[in-house]
Design a protein with these regions (language model features):
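Acidic, Ser/Pro/Thr-rich low-complexity regulatory regions
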Residues: 1-82
Length: 82
């Protein structure tokens, strides 16, 4: 799954109230460790605190790429969102 698809999932989850910023921060930490090269958004999200929901959303919106609509729909459905 690409980063943009995951970012869209987290954006929708945070704005719907079913995902909190701490979950996104933990994901960003994992991405930094596994990515061949870290990107600015990864470091920025990772350095946010759990109460900086809007800041996390802003950085998620900077993730480049194209979201895969099929994967995104499956993720959202699994979380009870559509």
């Amino acid at each position: 799954m690409n980063y943009r698809t995951q970012a869209e999932y987290y954006i929708k989850g945070i704005t719907s109230g079913v995902i909190d910023a701490a979950e996104v921060i933990a994901w960003s930490d994992e991405v930094i460790v596994s990515a061949p090269k870290s990107e600015d958004w990864m470091v920025e999200i990772s350095s946010c605190s759990a109460d900086e929901r809007l800041k996390v959303l802003g950085f998620l919106n900077t993730v480049k790429g194209e979201a895969d609509p099929v994967e995104l729909a499956a993720l959202l459905k699994a979380k009870g969102l559509s």
